[in-house]
Every structure is written in structure tokens, then in C-alpha cells.
Swiss-Prot record:
Keywords: DNA-binding, Nucleus, Transcription, Transcription regulation. One of its GO terms (cellular component) is nucleus. GO terms for molecular function: DNA binding. CDD domains: B3_DNA (cd10017). It holds the Pfam family B3. The keyword RNA-binding does not apply. This is B3 domain-containing protein Os03g0164300. The lineage of its organism: Eukaryota, Viridiplantae, Streptophyta, Embryophyta, Tracheophyta. InterPro entries: B3_DNA-bd, DNA-bd_pseudobarrel_sf. It is found in: Nucleus. Residues 1-91 bind DNA.
Length: 91
């Protein structure tokens, strides 16, 4: 899979995520709930203020961490002034 990305709504991005993005791009550590797997991803702010997970999102898809039709819950949390993300998959 090439160039996969996860995009968050403008209103959600502006309220909860964008303040953590330095410049238009920053790094984000993403972990999967219930596993020890973590993935380094790029967090990007688009021109219309949407936050997007880009580089690294493919790793999560390729690891088959979830299937089509699964519901993913994205739990953003601030730890020592750094944004981290834990993904919960509901099958």
C-alpha cells in the first residue's frame, strides 16, 4: 500500500491536535492498545487545518492491526507536553 494516510476532521484537529504540531509537520508515537507495538508516524497539518497521520500509517495497515469494518478509537493524550496516540480497535 502506498501513501496511506489517516485524516481527522477540521474542527477536531483545531481543538485537540494542531497545537501540538510544530510547523506543518511533526513526529508522533502511535501505539496499539493491547499490544507492545509502537509506530513512529508523521503528523501533518494540511492547508485547511486538518491533522493527518502520514508517514508510518502504512506500517499499521501492513501489520494488519485492523480489518475493513473494524471501528478504531483514537485516544490522544499529552505526556510531558508531548502528544501521543493510542489506537484501540473494536472488532
Amino acid at each position: 500500500m502506498t501513501n496511506a494516510k489517516m485524516t481527522f476532521a477540521v474542527q477536531f484537529s483545531e481543538r485537540y491536535i494542531n497545537k501540538y504540531i510544530g510547523s506543518p509537520i511533526d513526529d508522533l508515537m502511535v501505539s496499539m492498545a493491547g499490544t507492545t507495538q509502537s509506530y513512529q508516524m508523521r503528523l501533518k497539518r494540511s492547508k485547511d487545518s486538518r491533522a493527518m497521520l502520514t508517514t508510518g500509517w502504512n506500517q499499521l495497515i501492513d501489520a494488519k492491526a485492523f480489518d475493513e469494518g473494524d471501528v478504531c478509537l483514537f485516544h490522544f493524550k499529552e505526556v510531558d507536553d508531548v502528544l501521543v496516540l493510542k489506537v484501540h480497535v473494536l472488532k
